[in-house]
């Protein structure tokens, strides 16, 4: 329980969280920022989220007790990389933030232009900000021609960030290690988290197995995320199709439900397998229903800071089949809690899916174990308390 002094301090604090992407955009950073903001607000702080206006919404409003300030921007790469403008509206919004006299500033993710502006804003206000890392590998567009350019830009923008004083944290141990690639030392982790019971309770009444005509004895595997190269979703679909074409004599059929949208949807559709079910981007309630009903969640991703879907599946006692990306060290530390595969090649994923189909009892045990762990160690209240402690430490006089 928080002491009286801690409660008083939290209730008097003004905190600004910067995140280039925020709802209604969907993604791990967006969910992290929203959840941390809500947890800090519930602890009594006055919280503002400063973001880029990628969807043409109001420049300023209050959502569920949290102030939201949206800067005008140019939404490049389909909105994934917004460039903050410096027009008259932007200047008015910066002046508004300056008038709030924030005690603490937290910036999410390197390399966005809003992040650089956030670090400059904090420095001019006399605040040492936290910079939270959300990745564990370079950004990728899935192109051998474009990716080297993207990496060079990422390094250049990170160097610009490093001109300012900040204290770096990360959402997982792998993300902390990745900061070292840029010559940045991590002070520790402020992990991605989930309010597990609340997540499960919000599930809708949709029955995905019935909707898609999936037999009750089939292994139902869920994937949730952007359909882009780095998520490994095409390889996952190829693995599912290979099992459908050459089923095990004693194994269950494997059906894959893919929730999400993105550039690789056409590639998945062209595989032409009846055991692959594309259901589009799902709302939170429907996604919780899918995770609760699935026998396993697959995430053969190239890079994750600490995948939100990993936490969502764990909350639902659904074990993961996942590559060793950020968050697996903590949540899926060994095969008692899920299945770690060494790479995202289709044949590797296929072998893991076949093994899962042959061992339903092991899947159930993994699900029970990871559900207990996520409830014991990964609540948003706990991460918010760590964030406050980190802010205080960074700004000790």
Predicted regions and their residues:
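Short alpha-helical donor nucleotide-sugar binding micro-motif in glycosyltransferases
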Residues: 281-282, 289-294
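Aromatic "clamp/platform" in nucleotide-sugar-dependent glycosyltransferases that forms part
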Residues: 302
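Nucleotide-sugar donor phosphate/pyrophosphate-binding loop at the beta->alpha transition
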Residues: 128, 137-161, 169-170, 177
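Conserved acidic donor-binding segment of nucleotide-sugar-dependent glycosyltransferases
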Residues: 334-335, 339-346, 355-360
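Conserved donor-binding/catalytic core segment of Leloir-type glycosyltransferases
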Residues: 169, 215-231, 237-241
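Nucleotide-activated donor-binding/catalytic signature segment of Leloir-type glycosyltransferases, i.e.
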Residues: 266-285
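Carbohydrate-associated surface elements
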Residues: 53, 174, 193
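Short hydrophobic beta-strand element within catalytic cores of glycosyltransferases
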Residues: 319-322
């Amino acid at each position: 329980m928080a002491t009286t002094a801690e409660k008083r301090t939290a209730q008097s604090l003004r905190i600004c969280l910067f995140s280039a992407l925020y709802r209604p955009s969907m993604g791990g950073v967006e969910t992290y920022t929203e959840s941390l903001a809500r947890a800090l607000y519930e602890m009594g702080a006055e919280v503002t989220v400063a973001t880029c206006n990628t969807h043409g919404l109001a420049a300023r409003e209050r959502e569920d007790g949290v102030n939201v300030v949206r800067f005008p921007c140019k939404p490049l790469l389909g909105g994934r990389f917004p460039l903050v403008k410096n027009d008259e509206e932007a200047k008015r919004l910066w002046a508004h933030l300056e008038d709030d006299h924030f005690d603490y500033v937290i910036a999410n993710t390197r390399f966005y232009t809003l992040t650089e502006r956030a670090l400059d804003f904090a420095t001019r206000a006399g605040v040492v900000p936290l910079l939270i890392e959300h990745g564990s590998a370079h950004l990728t567009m899935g192109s051998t021609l474009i990716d080297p350019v993207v990496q060079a830009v990422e390094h250049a923008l990170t160097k610009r960030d490093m001109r300012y004083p900040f204290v770096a944290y990360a959402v997982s141990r792998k993300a902390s290690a990745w900061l070292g690639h840029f010559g940045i030392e991590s002070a520790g982790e402020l992990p991605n988290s989930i309010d597990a019971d609340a997540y499960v309770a919000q599930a809708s009444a949709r029955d995905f197995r019935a909707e898609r005509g999936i037999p009750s004895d089939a292994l139902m595997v869920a994937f949730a995320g952007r359909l882009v190269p780095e998520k490994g979703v095409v390889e996952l679909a190829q693995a599912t199709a290979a099992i459908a074409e050459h089923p095990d004599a004693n194994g269950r059929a494997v059906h894959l439900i893919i929730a999400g949208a993105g550039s690789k949807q056409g590639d998945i559709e062209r595989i032409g397998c009846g055991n692959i079910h594309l259901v589009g981007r799902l709302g939170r309630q429907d996604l919780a229903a899918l995770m609760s009903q699935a026998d396993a969640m697959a995430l053969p991703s190239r890079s994750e800071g600490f995948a939100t879907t990993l936490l969502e599946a764990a909350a639902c006692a659904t074990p993961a089949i996942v590559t060793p990306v950020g968050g697996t060290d903590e949540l899926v530390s060994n095969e008692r809690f899920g299945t770690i595969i060494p790479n995202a090649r289709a044949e590797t994923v296929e072998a893991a899916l076949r093994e899962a189909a042959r061992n339903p009892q092991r899947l159930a045990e993994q699900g029970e174990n990871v559900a207990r762990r996520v409830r014991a160690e990964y609540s948003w209240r706990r991460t918010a308390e760590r964030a406050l402690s980190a802010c205080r430490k960074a700004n000790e006089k």
